[in-house]
């Protein structure tokens, strides 16, 4: 989000002169395992992880019901996500022999593929219209794969990259931090859960019971940050059904736990072993630090995830610029 601090305000941007930056259509750059070194040294990696950690700090100790500023750009992003939600209602699952991967998802995705730039154009001011094709790629990448009808942390990362790009061009600002997580990302999660349930999407690259979650990772990071220094909720409480039911509307982490228990049967320790182990960690700050390390190791440093990440002018593959 620090990138956003250097941007000119977007409030009067409809009258501002067009930007002179050369935007490009993002493309894949990580083709083999040795290419992963390029990614870890890249400006894109530094900006992406910096964005995640800035938001992590911004929501620390705050409930979802915390009062925060909601800018016009935030409202427009929520409206965009509401449109995606409405399209799910308009595209019911079809009857098919296979239980998983309902083919109606491809119809839904084709609509997004066709309309993505128009949707992004409703969020981006006219003087930044040249950025729309580049930014829209990340939106299209963030909702799952239409060939495999699956969804995973790589798609979630594309949505975070989409938001990061909007910060870099100044559409989202430093004072939007809390709303980015609580209003936009939370709405995105709701829509993704609806997609997963409606079309019975497969988890992309799931590690089964040994993974943190079949589909998401970021809400566990930001959700654990929300719970740091909570007066009475400790990590051991998230495996307590009563504590989850009473507090899930205030905390993303607990909402994730509720969704898992709705979708899976059997003892929690068996279907979500990694989370069960985390419940034994003594403090939320330790949980938060551990999840950040795990996210880097299990998502950002894994070739099967990052091979699909796309790089453009806003999240470039070139090495981090050294500041002299």
Swiss-Prot record:
Residues the entry annotates as binding Mg(2+): 208, 214
Pfam families for this protein: PTPA
Places the protein is found: Cytoplasm; Nucleus
Single GO MF annotation: ATP binding
Domain of life (superkingdom): Eukaryota
InterPro entries assigned: Phstyr_phstse_ac (IPR004327), PTPA_C_lid (IPR043170), PTPA_sf (IPR037218)
Chain intervals for the UniProt region annotation (Disordered): 1-23
GO BP terms in the entry: mitotic spindle organization
Binding positions (ATP): 148, 153-154, 304, 307-308
Primary site of residence: cytoplasm
Key word Nucleotide-binding present: yes
Enzyme Commission designation: 5.2.1.8
Residues recorded with modification N-acetylalanine: 2
Top EC class, one word: isomerase
Keyword set, alphabetical order: Acetylation, ATP-binding, Cytoplasm, Isomerase, Magnesium, Metal-binding, Nucleotide-binding, Nucleus, Rotamase
Record-level GO cellular component terms: cytoplasm; nucleus; protein phosphatase type 2A complex
Record family assignment: Belongs to the PTPA-type PPIase family.
Quaternary structure and partners: Associates with the serine/threonine-protein phosphatase 2A PP2A(D) heterodimeric core enzyme, composed of a 36 kDa catalytic subunit (subunit C) and a 65 kDa constant regulatory subunit (PR65 or subunit A). Interacts with the catalytic subunit PPP2CA (via C-terminus). Interacts with PPP2CB.
Function description: PPIases accelerate the folding of proteins. It catalyzes the cis-trans isomerization of proline imidic peptide bonds in oligopeptides. Acts as a regulatory subunit for serine/threonine-protein phosphatase 2A (PP2A). Modulates PP2A activity or substrate specificity, probably by inducing a conformational change in the catalytic subunit, a proposed direct target of the PPIase. Can reactivate inactive phosphatase PP2A-phosphatase methylesterase complexes (PP2A(i)) in presence of ATP and Mg(2+).
Protein name in the entry: Serine/threonine-protein phosphatase 2A activator
Organism encoding this protein: Bos taurus
Organism phylogeny: Eukaryota, Metazoa, Chordata, Craniata, Vertebrata
Gene field: PTPA
């Amino acid at each position: 989000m620090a990138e956003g601090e250097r941007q000119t305000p977007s409030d009067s941007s409809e009258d501002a002169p067009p930007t002179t930056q050369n935007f490009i259509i993002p493309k894949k750059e990580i083709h083999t395992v040795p290419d992963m070194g390029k990614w870890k040294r890249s400006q894109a990696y530094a900006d992406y992880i910096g964005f995640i950690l800035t938001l992590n700090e911004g929501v620390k100790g705050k409930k979802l019901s915390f009062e925060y500023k909601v800018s016009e750009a935030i409202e427009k992003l929520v409206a965009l996500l509401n449109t995606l939600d409405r399209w799910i209602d308009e595209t019911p699952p079809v009857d098919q022999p296979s239980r998983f991967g309902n083919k109606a998802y491809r119809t839904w995705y084709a609509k997004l593929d066709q309309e993505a730039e128009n949707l992004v154009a409703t969020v981006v001011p006219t003087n930044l219209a040249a950025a729309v094709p580049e930014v829209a790629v990340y939106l299209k990448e963030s909702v799952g794969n239409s060939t495999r009808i699956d969804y995973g942390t790589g798609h979630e990362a594309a949505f975070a990259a989409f938001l990061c790009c909007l910060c870099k061009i100044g559409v989202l600002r430093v004072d939007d931090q809390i709303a980015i997580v609580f209003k936009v990302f939370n709405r995105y999660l709701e829509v993704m859960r609806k997609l997963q349930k409606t079309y019975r999407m497969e988890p992309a690259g799931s590690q089964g019971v040994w993974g943190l979650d079949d589909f998401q990772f970021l809400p566990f990071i930001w959700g654990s940050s929300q719970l740091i220094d909570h007066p009475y909720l400790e990590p051991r409480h998230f495996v307590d059904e009563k504590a989850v039911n009473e507090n899930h509307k205030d905390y993303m982490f607990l909402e994730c736990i509720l969704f898992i228990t709705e979708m899976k049967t059997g003892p929690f320790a068996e279907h979500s072993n990694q989370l069960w182990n985390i419940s034994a960690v003594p403090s939320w700050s330790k949980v938060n630090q551990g999840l950040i390390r795990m996210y880097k190791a299990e998502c950002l440093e894994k070739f099967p995830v990052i091979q699909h990440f796309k790089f453009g002018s806003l999240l470039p593959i070139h090495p981090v610029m050294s500041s002299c």
